[in-house]
Curated annotation (Swiss-Prot):
Catalyzes the attachment of glutamate to tRNA(Glu) in a two-step reaction: glutamate is first activated by ATP to form Glu-AMP and then transferred to the acceptor end of tRNA(Glu). This is Glutamate--tRNA ligase 1. Its main location: cytoplasm. A motif ('HIGH' region) lies at residues 8-18. It comes from Aliarcobacter butzleri (strain RM4018) (Arcobacter butzleri). Residues 117-137 are annotated as: Disordered. It holds the Pfam family Anticodon_2. PANTHER family: GLUTAMATE--TRNA LIGASE (PTHR43311), GLUTAMATE--TRNA LIGASE, MITOCHONDRIAL-RELATED (PTHR43311:SF2).
């Protein structure tokens, strides 16, 4: 039974890398019958944003990754952190350091000049027989943890395998600032231990933090969880993903017309696979996912793949679901007479809900202008006479407008009898009915709109001579 978590900082939006990590954590917890927790790491009070915090919660609600229990906020747990800092001080596993910023800057400069790795030199670290400097007046100390100075810090990573770090690389890092505020690596270790985390799945940019956190676990006698460090998502050129490439707010994907299932399907495949399978239901993800099978190398973001997946999900979900989704884009088809027919038609061509809306409104909205290039190419001197004759044909076949097949049945002889090619009739009709030349089949449009609406739109186009006013 795995207990996992996702722990974002509310200093910016939730991007897809974070969502992928949370998805992996969610799947593993649910698959094993464990718990998936959400923790907000908001100790950086100066950079916290209420808007970002809300966006994180909204994103989880939208994609349907339901977390267990209450949301943990680190800013509300400072008393707990202080208790453990005091415990470390009492046990001798942490100590007070009174070095000033100027002294630390001078130390760093000297080490860099000597081509040494900058690190704390242990001036205030208590050792048997060592005499510490006198405590300066009026200086509030920081608290440093006593890291091991010899040996190695090792752990088995579920993705990267056995990891080994020289202990002297960790340094006696600060676990509490001079104002008493605890630091990131300390509070993460405390929270993961107290929340009972068994498995920590996170980006491999956190790999260097892990030995620092293990020092805290060991100093307090906590059990070290299983770590899985997931490689980054790169752009197609193998570089860091930028906003232009797709590293944007998760909620931007909603605004761009992606379905949450498609986005999750896309993300689960960015670093994990099951043979050549591309489309996964949530049920299949839960059955098949195992974090030990996450790829060791970075994945590549493919926007075309995401669009393809989204188009497949748009075709697959129910029309009732699409009607609800389209309300977000200010289109309500609830009371439209042929809502199912128009959705069945439009969703075959749409890659996003934005495109779906446009495909629908191109048909149901009366055109306010006509595509100039289409008018120039397809509207001829005899077009008016041709469309008037076709309207008479529609009128005489009003009772046959209830199926696409019947409309096709009486239209094809009309085209042949008048010596026409299909575009000579259909493109002027498309322009008159939708304003453009890229709409779906004319038979489908006629079926959806019905005689009265077709009569009105064609006559309006003829009245305006297909000109924009």
């Amino acid at each position: 039974m795995a207990i996992t978590r996702f722990a974002p900082s509310p200093t910016g939006y939730l991007h897809i890398g974070g969502l992928r990590t949370s998805l992996y954590s969610y799947l593993w917890a649910r698959k094993t019958g464990g718990e998936f927790r959400l923790r907000i790491e908001d100790t950086d009070l100066a950079r916290n944003s209420e808007e970002a915090m809300k966006a994180i919660i909204d994103a989880f609600d939208w994609v349907g990754l339901n977390y267990d229990g209450e949301v943990f906020y680190q800013s509300k747990r400072t008393d707990i952190y202080k208790q453990y800092i005091d415990k470390l001080l009492e046990s001798g596993n942490a100590y007070k350091c009174y070095m000033s910023k100027e002294e630390l800057d001078a130390l760093r400069a000297a080490q860099e000049a000597a081509k040494q790795t900058p690190r704390y030199d242990g001036t205030w670290r208590p050792e048997p027989g060592k005499e510490l400097p006198p405590v300066p007046a009026g200086v509030e100390p920081v608290i440093r943890i006593k890291a091991p100075t010899t040996g190695t810090i090792e752990f088995d990573d579920g993705v990267k395998g056995h990891m080994k770090f020289d202990a002297n690389q960790v340094d006696d890092y600060v676990i509490a600032r001079s104002n008493g505020m605890p630091t990131y690596n300390f509070v993460v270790a405390i929270d993961d231990a107290l929340m009972g985390m068994t498995d920590v799945i996170r980006g491999d940019d956190h790999l260097s933090n892990t030995p620092k956190q293990i020092v805290v676990y060991n100093a307090l006698g906590f059990k070290v969880p299983k770590f899985y460090h997931v490689p980054m998502i790169n752009n197609p050129e193998g570089k860091k993903l930028s906003k232009r490439d797709g590293a944007m707010d998760v909620m931007d994907y909603k605004r761009l017309g992606y379905l949450p299932e498609a986005l999750l399907n896309f993300l689960v495949r960015l670093g994990w696979s099951n043979g050549d399978q591309e489309i996964f239901s949530m049920k299949e993800m839960l059955e098949l996912f195992d974090p030990s099978n996450i790829n060791k190398s970075a994945s590549s973001y493919n926007g075309e793949k995401l669009l393809w997946l989204n188009s497949e999900y748009i075709k697959a979900v129910s029309n009732e679901r699409l009607i609800e989704e389209l309300k977000f884009f200010d289109l309500d088809l609830s009371n439209y007479p042929k809502k199912n027919e128009i959705l069945d038609l439009a969703k075959q061509r749409a890659q996003t809900l934005v495109e779906l809306k446009k495909s629908i409104t191109d048909i149901i909205d009366i055109p306010t202008s006509y595509e100039e290039s289409g008018v120039k190419k397809f509207i001829k001197e005899d077009t008016k006479e041709l469309l008037e004759k076709y309207l008479l044909l529609l009128e005489s076949n009003k009772n046959s407008l209830d199926s696409v097949e019947k409309i096709e049945e009486f239209t094809k002889p009309f085209i042949n009898d008048n010596g026409l090619k299909f575009p000579q009739l259909f493109q002027p009709i498309r322009i008159a009915l939708t304003g453009g030349t890229q709409a779906p089949s004319v038979y489908d449009i006629i079926f959806i709109l019905g005689y009265d609406e077709i009569f009105k739109r064609i006559n309006e186009a003829l009245k305006r001579n297909f000109q924009n006013t």
